[in-house]
Amino acid sequence: MALTKAEMAEHLFETLGINKRVAKEMVEAFFEEIRQALENGEQVKLSGFGNFDLRDKNQRPGRNPKTGEDIPISARRVVTFRPGQKLKSRVEEANAGK
């Protein structure tokens, strides 16, 4: 099961007792801030959680799986996420007994 933005807003509503519309706007604003920073080429560091980074990938050879034809995969910039040590530890602890 995946956690959705709607579920995050619902959690804010239940936990903080704020209006549902305001909770949804807060979640949207949080992610919009991250999007804008990445669009501007900035790294996003969330203490205790992890970092969103931009990485440039060079052009490389690829292959069309249907035809087997060689085709170049163009150079591009991708977003990567590196979890922080606290997040890694909590996930490991949560899954240790499973």
From Swiss-Prot:
The keyword DNA-binding applies. It comes from the Bacteria. Heterodimer of an alpha and a beta chain. SMART domains: BHL. One of its GO terms (biological process) is DNA recombination. GO terms for molecular function: DNA binding; structural constituent of chromatin. This is Integration host factor subunit alpha. Keywords: DNA recombination, DNA-binding, Transcription, Transcription regulation, Translation regulation. InterPro entries: Hist_DNA-bd, Histone-like_DNA-bd_CS, IHF-like_DNA-bd_dom_sf, IHF_alpha. Belongs to the bacterial histone-like protein family. The keyword Hydrolase does not apply. The gene is ihfA. It holds the Pfam family Bac_DNA_binding. Residues 49-72 are annotated as: Disordered. This protein is one of the two subunits of integration host factor, a specific DNA-binding protein that functions in genetic recombination as well as in transcriptional and translational control. NCBIfam families: himA, PRK00285.1. One of its GO terms (cellular component) is cytosol. It comes from Shewanella loihica (strain ATCC BAA-1088 / PV-4).
